[in-house]
């Protein structure tokens, strides 16, 4: 059965290896980082935490090495501690290089964005001028349409006024026709009445004339032929 001290040594070594791999992975992430600067800052914060954990575990392993009873095991563990320290220093150097590479990449990207931003500003200026010209053209077109619609409205009003006048004229003519129709009907009645009266007058004249002739004949008869 392994001694408790050996178990602690094994666990400590495993954690040192784990933190070392995590540091290497974060350093690679920094190499691949193209910005922004806040992303780089976040990665560096994680690297610092892992380095601190790694340093503590190396110190724990060194303390365990010093507590070994056998000199050979002590020296072996101290050699491992030294190797871990060298590896940590190598990781720190790689970390600095990765930061330098990342910062250069970010600077280049920012310069490219500035240049592109100038192009974008020129494009925006051109676009604004084009939009202003288009807006002016659209405004003129709308004003032309508005004038045309106003003319059409005026023509419609004039046509409506003409229709109203024509309708009024027709109504007046209709009233005149009605008045004339009444006058014609009245004239017809008067003519009919006059015709009837004329016939009656003729009949009365004829009767009076007949009566007069009869009277004359009677008088003549009495005078000329008294014996009859």
From Swiss-Prot:
Entry's localization field: Endoplasmic reticulum membrane; Mitochondrion membrane
GO cellular component: COPI-coated vesicle; cytoplasm; endoplasmic reticulum; endoplasmic reticulum membrane; intracellular membrane-bounded organelle; mitochondrial membrane; mitochondrial outer membrane; nuclear envelope
CDD domains recorded: SNARE_SEC20
Topological category with respect to the lipid bilayer: Single-pass type IV membrane protein
Name of the protein described by the UniProt record: Vesicle transport protein SEC20
Stretches of the chain found on the membrane's Cytoplasmic side: 1-199
Subunit organization: Component of a SNARE complex consisting of STX18, USE1L, BNIP1/SEC20L and SEC22B. Interacts directly with STX18, RINT1/TIP20L and NAPA. Interacts with ZW10 through RINT1. Interacts with BCL2. Interacts with RNF186. Interacts with RNF185. Interacts with SQSTM1; increased by 'Lys-63'-linked polyubiquitination of BNIP1. (Microbial infection) Interacts with adenovirus E1B 19K protein; plays a role in the suppression of cell apoptosis by the viral protein.
Job of this protein: As part of a SNARE complex may be involved in endoplasmic reticulum membranes fusion and be required for the maintenance of endoplasmic reticulum organization. Also plays a role in apoptosis. It is for instance required for endoplasmic reticulum stress-induced apoptosis. As a substrate of RNF185 interacting with SQSTM1, might also be involved in mitochondrial autophagy.
Keywords from the UniProt entry: Apoptosis, Coiled coil, Endoplasmic reticulum, ER-Golgi transport, Host-virus interaction, Membrane, Mitochondrion, Transmembrane, Transmembrane helix, Transport, Ubl conjugation
GO BP annotations listed: apoptotic process; apoptotic process in response to mitochondrial fragmentation; endoplasmic reticulum membrane fusion; endoplasmic reticulum organization; execution phase of apoptosis; negative regulation of apoptotic process; response to activity; response to oxygen-glucose deprivation
Record topological domains on the Lumenal side: 221-228
Tissues expressing the protein: Isoform 1 is highly expressed in heart, brain, liver skeletal muscle and pancreas. Isoform 3 is moderately expressed in placenta, lung and kidney. Isoform 4 is highly expressed in testis and small intestine.
